[in-house]
Swiss-Prot record:
This is Protein-glutamate methylesterase/protein-glutamine glutaminase 1. One of its GO terms (cellular component) is cytoplasm. It comes from Cupriavidus pinatubonensis (strain JMP 134 / LMG 1197) (Cupriavidus necator (strain JMP 134)). InterPro entries: CheB-like (IPR008248), CheB_C (IPR035909), CheY-like_superfamily (IPR011006), Sig_transdc_resp-reg_Me-estase (IPR000673), Sig_transdc_resp-reg_receiver (IPR001789). Residues 146-331 form the CheB-type methylesterase domain. The active site is at 158, 185, 278. Keywords: Chemotaxis, Cytoplasm, Hydrolase, Phosphoprotein. GO terms for molecular function: phosphorelay response regulator activity; protein-glutamate methylesterase activity; protein-glutamine glutaminase activity. The keyword Hydrolase applies. Its EC number is 3.1.1.61, 3.5.1.44. The lineage of its organism: Bacteria, Pseudomonadati, Pseudomonadota, Betaproteobacteria, Burkholderiales. GO terms for biological process: chemotaxis. The modification 4-aspartylphosphate is found at residue 53. Transmembrane segments: none annotated. It catalyses: [protein]-L-glutamate 5-O-methyl ester + H2O = L-glutamyl-[protein] + methanol + H(+); L-glutaminyl-[protein] + H2O = L-glutamyl-[protein] + NH4(+).
Amino acid sequence: MKVGIVNDSALAVAALRRAIALDPAFEIVWVAGDGEQAVQLAASHTPDVILMDLLMPVMDGVEATRRIMAATPCPIVVVTTDLGRNATQVFDAMGHGAIDAVDTPTLTESDAKLTAGPLLRKMRNIGRLVAGRAAPRPAITEMPGTLAASRLVAIGASAGGPAALAKLLGALPADFCAAVVAVQHVDEAFAPGMADWLDSQCALPVRVAAPGETPQAGTVLIAGTNNHLRLLGSNRMAYTEQPSEYLYRPSIDVFFESVVEYWRGQAIGVLLTGMGRDGASGLKAMRDHGCLTIAQDQATSAVYGMPKAAAAMGAASEILPLTAIAPRLVQACCSVRPPPG
């Protein structure tokens, strides 16, 4: 797996080299000292993954991500020394198509393997994604529903998702009459900051879903751990380690499939921009179950992977530009009465 590094710090580059050397499957093919050089190298020697710093001279990582994803798209992981302090820039980069974010590994010998672990796990997942070796989806088992009838909008997003979620959720009215639950591929250390950022962009309250919480109309819940978020028959949200075979944690497919299993009110599935196929089979299960299902169109997707997979398998009953999704949700959820409980 060919790796490009974009970082102006010699110490950070040395730490990344040491971390990557722990896995012989990875090969560093170039190192860029700023975003402008990275854009040029990505165009001439496109790697399998780029490890992108944020704060650099000449051109920062956000602009470099935007240009690379527009010209020669490939998986980009933001690697920076302080995710929390650089949260705004991380969200901007993910809005332009960066697939994930992680702290820079340390160079200290005693901590090298420990701090390299999160980065290497993300890179291995990307390698499986690029190779098309995502784990097969287990069959859905129909189970008796116990949730009270209500309206639920289930949303999945990956690369480019934070910006897409901000636009979609920001266009929903404060009195939106359905519960909203979103699964965005992001590390658990970063989820609370993303929820706070989305909350500042929307009229609806946004927060990380807590174990045992019940989805409520007019509130947005965001998956907040590296386990799967799902509905259970107790009318509450839960985080579970199983199923273990899914490439992504949290998995959009797992959440969508739990909606099929347990939600007996009106449900709508929405699959936004993202790399790979996560969410496509779950969206198909929702459509087969009689739910309205929406996939973001190619023109407005930062990365047209997950919505493309959904469209190809007939999972989306409607394919819409991002700006049309919120009005469609309002029309579908708020212009009709919910089914009787």
